[in-house]
Design a protein with these regions (language model features):
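Outer-membrane beta-barrel pore domains
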Residues: 28, 136, 190-192, 214, ...
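Outer membrane beta-barrel
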Residues: 97-262, 282-299, 306-314, 374-394, ...
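Intrinsically disordered, low-complexity Ser/Thr- and acidic-rich flexible linkers and loops
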Residues: 84, 270-272, 303-304, 448-460
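Active-site-proximal beta-alpha loop/turn segments in soluble metabolic enzymes
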Residues: 260-279
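N-terminal periplasmic/intermembrane-space "pro-region" immediately following the signal or transit peptide
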Residues: 25-122, 267, 300-303, 473, ...
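Interfacial loop-to-helix transition and helix-capping segments at the boundaries
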Residues: 275-283, 337-339
Length: 478
C-alpha cells in the first residue's frame, strides 16, 4: 500500500468520524437549547405573575387611599357645617330650632321651650235690610271683623303651656252696651298647668265652659259667625281659673271667674266690655261654671270644629253645663243681680255630614226694683252636608230671647242658609250666608241688653218678618 492510499484511507476515516460525531452531537445541542428556552419562559412567566401581583396590590392601595381621602374630606365638610350651625345658634340662643309644622314655630333643641306663631284674619262684607219708615232701610259695607296673632307653646317643660291672642276686633262683640268700635284688644290670654290624674289648671282670660258654640274657636264655626242666640245666652269670656279633667270618654270643666257679661251681670263691663278687668272694679261676688261632655262615639278632636269633611269617621257628643253668679252691690241698697243658667247640646258628625242642636235657659233676679225676674230662652239647630270635596251647604235656625215684654221680647226667629268654600281647608275659606228673621229683634229695655248685634249684622226691629242679612267672609288662618 503506497502513501497515497494511506492518506486517502486516513482522510476517509477522519471524515467519517467527524460526520458521525456531528450526527451524535446535534441532538444534544438542540435539547440543551430547548431546555434553556423553557427555563427562560418559566422565568418570564414568573416575572409576569410577580408584576401582576404588584399591580393588583397597587390598585388596592390606590382605592383604599381614595376612600380614606374621600372620608377625610367628608369629615372636614361635616365639621365645617356643624361649626357654622353652632355659630348661627350662638347668635340666636342655645340650640334654637325653627320652621313650619302645622304652623310656624321656634323651639329649643332640648325640647323645654316652644313658641307657636299663628294668626287669623276675617274680612267680612255685610248687607242688611230693615223694612222701616223711620230708619235707613239699606245698610252695609266691608269690615275687618277679626285680625289677630296667636302665640302659644310651652315653657320649662311640656306640662306648662300658654296662649295669647291679641289684635284688632270688636270691643263689644256681645253688644252689651252696645259699642261699635273696632280697636286693639285681647281674646284668650292664659297659662295652663298639667296636673296628676288627668287634671289641668288654667289661669287668665278664657271662654267660660258653657255652650259648645262658644267653645268652638272663631275660625272653626260653620256659618260666618256664631248664632245671635249664643252671643246673648252664651257666657263669653271672663277671667279666672279653670280646672279640667279629661278621660277617654268624659271631660269635666270647672271654672271660677269674675262672671259673665252677656246679660249685663258684670257692672265693670258697662265701661269695658272686654276682659281683663282691674281687680278692684265691680264684677261679681262669686261665679261658678261647670260643664261635662260625654263622647258617645268617635274622637275628641272631631269636635274642635263644626264641619265634618268627607271621609271622616262617625262621632257623637253630648254636653251639659250650669252657671251661677252673685252680683256685687252697685250702690242701690238691696239690689244685687243674681243669675243662674243651664244648657245642653248634642252634636253628630259623619262622612261629610253634621247635625247640632242646643237649648239654653237663664234666670236673672233684681234687674230693676219693679222687675224682679228676667227669663231668657234660646234654641239653635244647624246641619250641613258636603256637595263636593270642597263645597259645603249648611242651614241653621235660631230662636229665643227674653220672656218678659218689659225687658224686650223672645220673638227672634232667624233662618240662615249658606255655603262654605274650603279653598285650603279651614286655613283659607270663603263663607256666604243669607239670614231672614221671621220675628222681631229687641233693642233692649229696662236694663236688658236686647238681641240686636251689629257685628252679626242684625239691627233692632219692631216689625215681624221685616229684616234680612247677607254676609260674605274671607278667612285666612294659620
Amino acid at each position: 500500500m503506497n502513501n497515497i492510499a494511506k492518506h486517502a484511507i486516513t482522510m476517509a476515516v477522519v471524515v467519517s468520524a467527524l460526520f458521525c460525531g456531528t450526527l451524535f452531537a446535534q441532538p444534544i445541542d438542540i435539547q440543551e437549547q430547548l431546555d434553556a428556552l423553557r427555563q427562560r419562559l418559566d422565568d418570564v412567566q414568573s416575572d409576569t405573575e410577580g408584576m401582576r401581583n404588584e399591580l393588583d396590590e397597587l390598585k388596592v392601595e390606590e382605592l383604599d387611599w381614595l376612600t380614606k381621602e374621600r372620608a377625610d374630606e367628608i369629615r372636614v365638610l361635616v365639621r365645617e357645617v356643624l361649626a357654622d350651625a353652632d355659630a348661627r345658634n350662638s347668635l340666636a340662643g342655645d340650640g334654637l330650632l325653627g320652621g313650619w309644622s302645622d304652623g310656624f314655630f321656634l323651639a329649643s333643641s332640648d325640647g323645654r321651650f316652644k313658641l307657636n306663631i299663628g294668626g287669623l284674619m276675617q274680612q267680612r262684607f255685610l248687607q242688611n235690610f230693615v223694612r222701616s219708615d223711620v230708619q235707613d232701610r239699606w245698610r252695609g259695607g266691608l269690615e275687618s271683623t277679626r285680625t289677630r296673632l296667636n302665640f302659644s307653646g310651652h315653657v320649662f317643660d311640656k306640662d306648662t303651656t300658654f296662649l295669647v291672642q291679641a289684635g284688632y276686633g270688636y270691643l263689644d262683640p256681645n253688644a252689651v252696651l252696645p259699642n261699635f268700635r273696632i280697636a286693639d284688644r285681647l281674646w284668650d290670654a292664659w297659662i295652663k298647668f298639667k296636673l296628676d290624674g288627668g287634671w289641668s289648671a288654667k289661669l287668665g282670660v278664657f271662654m267660660l265652659p258653657f255652650t259648645r258654640e262658644s267653645l268652638v274657636s272663631d275660625e272653626y264655626q260653620l256659618a260666618v259667625d256664631r248664632s245671635l242666640i249664643d252671643y246673648r245666652l252664651g257666657l263669653a269670656r271672663s277671667q279666672g281659673v279653670e280646672f279640667t279633667w279629661a278621660g277617654d270618654a268624659t271631660r269635666v270643666f270647672l271654672a271660677m271667674s269674675n262672671g259673665s257679661i252677656t246679660l249685663r251681670g258684670v257692672p265693670a263691663s258697662q265701661t269695658n266690655p272686654t276682659p281683663p278687668w282691674a281687680s278692684l272694679q265691680q264684677d261679681v261676688e262669686w261665679s261658678f261654671t261647670a260643664r261635662t261632655e260625654f263622647l258617645l262615639e268617635g274622637r275628641w278632636g272631631q269636635f274642635n270644629q263644626f264641619t265634618s269633611p268627607p271621609g271622616s269617621e262617625r262621632g257623637m257628643l253630648w254636653g251639659v253645663a250650669v252657671h251661677a253668679q252673685n252680683g256685687e252691690r252697685t250702690g242701690r241698697v238691696g239690689l244685687k243681680q243674681d243669675q243662674v243658667g243651664i244648657t245642653s247640646d248634642f252634636s253628630f258628625h259623619s262622612d261629610g255630614v253634621t247635625f247640632f242642636a242646643s237649648g239654653t235657659f237663664h234666670n236673672q233676679k233684681n234687674l230693676r226694683a219693679t222687675i224682679p225676674n228676667g227669663d231668657w230662652v234660646g234654641y239653635v239647630v244647624q246641619a250641613s252636608t258636603y256637595m263636593t270635596d270642597k263645597t259645603e251647604y249648611f242651614v241653621r235656625f235660631a230662636s229665643g230671647g227674653v220672656l218678659q215684654d218689659s225687658l224686650g221680647n223672645d220673638d227672634v226667629n232667624i233662618l240662615t242658609n249658606g255655603i262654605n268654600w274650603y279653598l285650603d281647608g279651614q286655613g283659607l275659606k270663603v263663607t256666604s250666608d243669607f239670614g231672614w228673621n221671621f220675628g222681631e229683634i229687641s233693642g233692649g229695655a229696662n236694663g236688658s241688653p236686647g238681641m240686636a248685634n251689629s257685628m252679626l249684622g242684625w239691627r233692632p226691629q219692631i216689625k215681624q218678618s221685616a229684616q234680612w242679612v247677607f254676609r260674605t267672609q274671607l278667612q285666612l288662618a294659620f
